[in-house]
Amino acid sequence: MTVVTMKQLLEAGVHFGHQTRRWDPKMAPYIFTQRNGIYIIDLQKTIKMLDDAYNYVKAVAQDGGVFLFVGTKKQAQDAVKEEATRAGQYYVNQRWLGGTLTNWTTIQSRVKRLKELKQMSEDGTFDVLPKKEVALLTKEMEKLERFLGGIEDMPRIPDVMFVVDPKKEKIAVHEANILGIPVVAMVDTNTDPDPIDVVIPANDDAIRAIRLISGAMADAIIEGKQGQDDSEDVEKEMADKAAAEDDEEESIEVVVEKSED
């Protein structure tokens, strides 16, 4: 069963690429035709590659993987935040701060500062400070929240990064490549697909297209996590059963020993 239907892809405008004069030749295998100076993406390939991406993401989620959604362009900001949050994962939907992954220790110190400021705001510390100081601290907190709020609780460097428009997010993609973090991405006709590990050929400018693909990735994570929970339940049942059998064997041995006495 396919993750999304051809009808859904068409209605969301996933097939519309960029103008033919703005293209990357490496995307040629994913282009169906051109119409009125616009490349049309081959949706048969999109369906197949989206299915592959879904299964890959689901498998990583089932192993307890951590995911980072990245999309800072205006069209992507809401979908990236909402779908990452729905899947219980993390996101960057404002400016990507250089070193977010490659300088994780420094970023963690800024996250710690954000948490400190939030605590001060909540525990009444701001109420006893001068108004001017509170204004400065509030401004600092809001700035940190804007850029780091989506990764505030991320426990470690992600296992997989999902990207909307890797051409725009080239710094994020480069950092992931350096660290060997697999990148799953919506790749439009104007983008080099080589730095991407799992390519989803798609219009990365249309809000509906972004929401559809981001939603599919969130669904994959949720399904994978459900599978993880199920497997943990099975493992627990098997462990409990094994323990019960051990207890039963011990009881039998005791009975046998007593009968021999």
Swiss-Prot record:
InterPro entries, A to Z: Ribosomal_uS2, Ribosomal_uS2_bac/mit/plastid, Ribosomal_uS2_CS, Ribosomal_uS2_flav_dom_sf
Concerning Gene3D superfamilies, the annotation shows: Glucose-6-phosphate isomerase like protein, domain 1, Helix hairpin bin
**Which key words are in the record?**
Ribonucleoprotein, Ribosomal protein
Cross-referenced Pfam families, in alphabetical order? Ribosomal_S2
In Swiss-Prot or TrEMBL terms, this protein is called Small ribosomal subunit protein uS2
* Residue ranges crossing the lipid bilayer per the database entry: none
Provide the Gene Ontology terms for cellular component. cytosolic small ribosomal subunit
Q: What is the species listed in this Swiss-Prot or TrEMBL entry?
A: Lactobacillus johnsonii (strain CNCM I-12250 / La1 / NCC 533)
Name any one GO molecular function.
structural constituent of ribosome
UniProt keyword annotation of rRNA-binding present: no
Q: Name one GO biological process term.
A: translation
Give the family from UniProt.
Belongs to the universal ribosomal protein uS2 family.
* Domain of life of the native organism: Bacteria
> Residues annotated as region Disordered?
223-261
